[in-house]
Amino acid sequence: MKITTKVLIIGSGPAGLSAAIYAARASLNPILINGIQPGGQLTITTDVENYPGFAESVQGPWLMEQMRMQAENVGTKIVNDYVEKVDLSQRPFKVSTGSRTEYEAESIIICTGAEARWLGIPTEQEFMGFGVSACATCDGFFFKNQKVVVVGGGNSAVEEALYLTNHASKVTIVHRRDNFRAEKILQERLFKNPKISVIWDHVVEEIVGNNNPKSVTGVKIQNVHTKETSLVNCSGVFVAIGHKPNTALFAEQVTMDNDNYIITTPGSTKTNIEGVFAAGDVQDKIYRQAITAAGTGCMAALEAEKFLNK
């Protein structure tokens, strides 16, 4: 089956749904392809306290459901499918999905997001949202005056640890090596902070916790040399071993940086291909927040409208 559209949005997180809302209100009749994880990363987030408009915290899945309904109510067609292949060599752009549907689009907004790199250990997924996080800015507030562990040794880990000292009583970094890869200025700030301690040459083997109520109580760590294990008591575990953008579909077509994030024109969502725009975490390695993703989704829709009206 072949379907034609003016605007095709790939991805259904805050960026994709915001783009859909603005595109629909501009009478562009957008089609949005949900992807494998409808709603994006917020669907695995419990309490959301930093999205404007809500005096009390809201649940991530509920927030994304509201965005989805809003997008549909203003005229977006949302398709439960995922993209398998993209051809951006000429307009109309061609997109093939898992259901064997072929789309031809005059413009495309890429909102496929990014995902945290996880440890891949037992109980990590079990305590996701119940003490395990990959975003200190999002979840640090919930650990006021509590002990937390940060896993990692790069810029992300050090920055997360420094941020968490604003909330936690103690921050312990567990790193598998005997030195950090982080920038020297960040390391200097970290070593000067009395709230932070570092456990070198260790890896996290297991996250320990309770089931009623579900909560983290500590991490079991192992020395990479001696193989001895020990327990570090904590209420939260922040995994900071990097993020990876979901950009494999667009490789060798859209220009990306060394970390495979899509490069956009400064102050814009335009990519190197005219008529193709990118919004949200897929082009943002710095902020990675729902509100910034939504903002760039809005920008992409407005820029797509302007492009189509040329």
UniProtKB/Swiss-Prot annotation:
What UniProt keywords apply to this chain's record, in alphabetical order? Answer: Cytoplasm, Disulfide bond, FAD, Flavoprotein, NADP, Oxidoreductase, Redox-active center
Recite the UniProt cofactor note for this protein: Binds 1 FAD per subunit.
Record PROSITE patterns = PYRIDINE_REDOX_2 (PS00573)
Q: Which Pfam families match?
A: Pyr_redox_2
- Identify the domain of life: Bacteria
Q: Which GO terms describe its molecular function?
A: thioredoxin-disulfide reductase (NADPH) activity
Q: Where in the cell is it found?
A: Cytoplasm
| GO BP term, example | removal of superoxide radicals
Cofactors: FAD
Intrachain S-S bonds: 135-138
- Which family is annotated? Belongs to the class-II pyridine nucleotide-disulfide oxidoreductase family.
By its UniProt entry, which NCBIfam families does this protein fall under? TRX_reduct
Task: Give any extra note attached to this record.
Answer: The active site is a redox-active disulfide bond.
User: Per its record, how is this protein called by name?
Assistant: Thioredoxin reductase
Species name for this entry? Rickettsia bellii (strain RML369-C)
Which gene does this sequence derive from? trxB
